[in-house]
């Protein structure tokens, strides 16, 4: 069952401009260490596209959470990570994780699906948050208090 959906488009040139003006301050406030490491392994437009896709993913996730960046949800609470298959997803911490927990129905788990793409000068991301049944071994006194 879908419980949240969000999308965002980001102008890569905007990220370039913000980085020129604010550099490290912007990077440390918006991106996780892992996101920064991934982007810094790339050059030129690929590096900017990597940052812009992750920026768009954070915006899309905030929309899917239904709060935007309010109610204790901050950009630093959202980090793009890759599953072992290479598929991107988001790791939520802090206020974002609390909001995700609050919006997930009892007895269900949350699944965060993410897709990202870029074609200069734009980056795009879409997030779908689904509530999925927990394995029965975790429900009803067989694993959960």
UniProtKB/Swiss-Prot annotation:
Keywords for this protein: Cytoplasm, Fatty acid biosynthesis, Fatty acid metabolism, Lipid biosynthesis, Lipid metabolism, Magnesium, Metal-binding, Transferase
InterPro entries (alphabetical): 4-PPantetheinyl_Trfase_dom, 4-PPantetheinyl_Trfase_dom_sf, ACPS, Ppantetheine-prot_Trfase_dom
Pfam families: ACPS (PF01648)
Translocase as UniProt keyword: no
Superkingdom classification of source: Bacteria
Catalyzed reaction equations: apo-[ACP] + CoA = holo-[ACP] + adenosine 3',5'-bisphosphate + H(+)
GO molecular function per UniProt: holo-[acyl-carrier-protein] synthase activity; magnesium ion binding
Chain sites annotated for binding Mg(2+): 8, 59
Cellular component per GO, a single term: cytoplasm
Gene Ontology biological process: fatty acid biosynthetic process
Cofactor(s), names only, from the UniProt record: Mg(2+)
HAMAP family: AcpS
Role of this protein: Transfers the 4'-phosphopantetheine moiety from coenzyme A to a Ser of acyl-carrier-protein.
Protein name in UniProt: Holo-[acyl-carrier-protein] synthase
Organism phylogeny: Bacteria, Pseudomonadati, Pseudomonadota, Alphaproteobacteria, Acetobacterales
């Amino acid at each position: 069952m879908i419980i949240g959906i969000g999308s965002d488009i980001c102008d890569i040139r905007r990220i370039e401009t913000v980085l020129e003006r604010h550099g490290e301050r912007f990077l440390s406030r918006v991106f996780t260490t892992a996101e920064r490491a991934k982007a810094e392994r790339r050059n030129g437009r690929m590096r900017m596209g990597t940052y812009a896709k992750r920026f768009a993913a954070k915006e899309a996730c905030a929309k899917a959470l239904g709060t935007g960046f309010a109610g204790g949800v901050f950009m630093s609470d959202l980090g793009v990570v890759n599953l072992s298959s290479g598929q991107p997803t988001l790791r939520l911490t802090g206020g974002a994780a609390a909001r995700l927990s609050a919006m997930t129905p009892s007895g269900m788990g949350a699944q965060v699906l993410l897709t990202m793409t870029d074609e200069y000068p734009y980056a795009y991301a879409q997030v779908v948050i689904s509530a999925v049944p927990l394995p029965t071994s975790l429900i009803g006194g067989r694993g959960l208090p």
